[in-house]
């Protein structure tokens, strides 16, 4: 099996992508980041997901993005909340972490070179998402082009591919795909502002998108919510 790198946050999307990479015949190594996020319970979720899917190589990289701040996920800025039936506001929300996907994909690129992998999987989505600019197809294409100019492996003839299997799927479709592949969503963590014991808030954009996805799929969300 070919090696691949999968960015694994511990959330619903990345767990699904990890299962997809396995189903497509890759031998995935998972890469998770401890970047100073307020929702650090996702690190434990990533460990659970990696174990459940039989991933032998799971690395956790420490990068402290709190030194820059500028996001509700890495500073004292309040996480926006709303009700399930409210539309998520247009524009880029304060939960956007400046350059996060670029930073993480760069780490994944370095990891791929070390492992001799030519494939990186990431769970970005441009349908049911919060409007982050680094989740768009054009961004992924641009990063892939850069990667194939910037690495020793590419210069020597090994073309790198960034896989985005969820990019055009609704959240409900993602959930259905994951369930078909045996993903246990009860062990994932999606919330941006969980309680200290790991319960989801149920009102941040991420929780609302997740809940709407399960409703679309006609299923109950197995996550534990504080309210």
Curated annotation (Swiss-Prot):
Reaction(s) this enzyme catalyzes, per UniProt: 7-carboxy-7-deazaguanine + NH4(+) + ATP = 7-cyano-7-deazaguanine + ADP + phosphate + H2O + H(+)
Entry cofactor note text? Binds 1 zinc ion per subunit.
Give a single Pfam family match: QueC
Q: Does Ligase show up as a keyword for this record?
A: yes
Annotated GO biological process: queuosine biosynthetic process
Alphabetized InterPro entries for the sequence: QueC, Rossmann-like_a/b/a_fold
Q: Which enzyme class?
A: ligase
| GO molecular-function terms, A-Z | ATP binding; ligase activity, forming carbon-nitrogen bonds; zinc ion binding
Q: In which pathway does it act?
A: Purine metabolism; 7-cyano-7-deazaguanine biosynthesis
The signal sequence is: none
Stated family? Belongs to the QueC family.
NCBIfam families per UniProt = 7-cyano-7-deazaguanine synthase QueC
The record's HAMAP family line, in alphabetical order, gives:
QueC
Q: What does this protein do?
A: Catalyzes the ATP-dependent conversion of 7-carboxy-7-deazaguanine (CDG) to 7-cyano-7-deazaguanine (preQ(0)).
Name this protein carries in UniProt = 7-cyano-7-deazaguanine synthase
Taxonomic source organism = Paramagnetospirillum magneticum (strain ATCC 700264 / AMB-1)
Organism lineage: Bacteria, Pseudomonadati, Pseudomonadota, Alphaproteobacteria, Rhodospirillales
Name the encoding gene, please.
Answer: queC
């Amino acid at each position: 099996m070919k090696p691949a790198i999968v960015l694994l946050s511990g959330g619903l999307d990345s767990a699904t992508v990890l299962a997809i990479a396995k189903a497509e015949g890759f031998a995935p190594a998972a890469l998770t980041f401890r970047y100073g996020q307020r929702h650090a319970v996702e690190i434990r979720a990533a460990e659970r997901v990696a174990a459940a899917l039989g991933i032998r190589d799971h690395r956790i990289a420490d990068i402290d993005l709190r030194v820059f701040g500028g996001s509700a996920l890495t500073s004292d800025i309040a996480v926006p909340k709303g009700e399930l039936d409210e539309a998520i506001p247009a524009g880029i929300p304060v939960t956007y972490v400046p350059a996060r996907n670029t930073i993480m994909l760069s780490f994944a690129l370095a990891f791929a070179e070390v492992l001799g992998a030519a494939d990186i999987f990431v769970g970005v989505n441009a349908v049911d998402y919060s409007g982050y600019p680094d989740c768009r197809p054009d961004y992924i294409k641009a990063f892939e082009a850069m990667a194939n100019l910037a690495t020793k492996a590419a210069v020597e003839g090994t073309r790198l591919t960034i896989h985005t299997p969820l990019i055009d799927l609704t959240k409900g479709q993602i959930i259905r795909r994951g369930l078909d592949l045996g993903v246990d969503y009860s062990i994932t963590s999606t919330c941006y502002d969980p309680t200290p014991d790991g319960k989801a808030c149920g009102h941040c954009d991420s929780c609302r998108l997740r809940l709407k996805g399960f409703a679309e799929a006609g299923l109950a969300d197995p996550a534990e919510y504080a309210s």
